């Protein structure tokens, strides 16, 4: 298993990323799992370098990439014609690595996984089922999108509060509100 994080690479003065040599690159295992925990473009470039080393040194390989958080996932739409579709740009770069499989955890929407070749989204309720989550007094859904997901969780019958975001015409959040029980003094879990 290869972990890509801020300790996996160095950055030269010109901004260039250089992946540190990893012992596993010399082993002839053929199957590699890469977990990318650095969601910056430096992290992505380190991932791309790891994939390049594996492909250069092995004629047969199986590369699985895991992104616990999909970079640019929240930029899954275009608000005006002059704005970039950042998620699409990132997913094109990721797909260009031609890895065997990509897993993302609880993608913000179906858009991101749909734009990545050979991608599977691990939904929130599956992650939740595998975690040792301490019981909470109140489960908070931060927005309407998350509220849809919370209904699939085993806590769906528990006390739930719904958060909403009020945006201006440019999409910036100008206010937030929480509907439901008060959160003060309670152990809350934002889902």
Where are these predicted regions, by residue range?
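PRPP-associated nucleotide enzymes
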Residues: 1-191
């Amino acid at each position: 298993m290869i972990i890509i994080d801020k300790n996996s690479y160095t950055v030269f003065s010109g901004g260039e990323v250089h992946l540190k040599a990893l012992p596993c690159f010399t082993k002839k295992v053929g199957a590699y799992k890469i977990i990318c925990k650095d969601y910056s473009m430096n992290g992505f470039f380190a991932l791309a370098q790891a994939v390049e080393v594996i492909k250069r040194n092995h004629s047969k390989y199986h590369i699985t990439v895991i992104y616990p958080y999909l970079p640019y996932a929240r930029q899954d739409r275009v608000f005006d014609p002059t704005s970039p579709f950042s998620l699409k740009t990132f997913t094109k770069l990721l797909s260009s690595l031609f890895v065997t499989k990509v897993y993302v955890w609880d993608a913000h929407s179906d858009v991101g996984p749909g734009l990545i070749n050979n991608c599977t989204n691990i939904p929130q309720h599956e992650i939740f089922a595998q975690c040792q989550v301490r019981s909470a007094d109140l489960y908070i859904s931060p927005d309407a999108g998350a509220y849809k997901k919370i209904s699939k969780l085993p806590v769906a019958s528990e006390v739930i509060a719904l958060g909403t975001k009020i945006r201006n015409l440019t999409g910036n959040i100008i206010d937030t509100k929480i509907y439901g029980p008060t959160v003060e003094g309670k152990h809350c879990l934002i889902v």
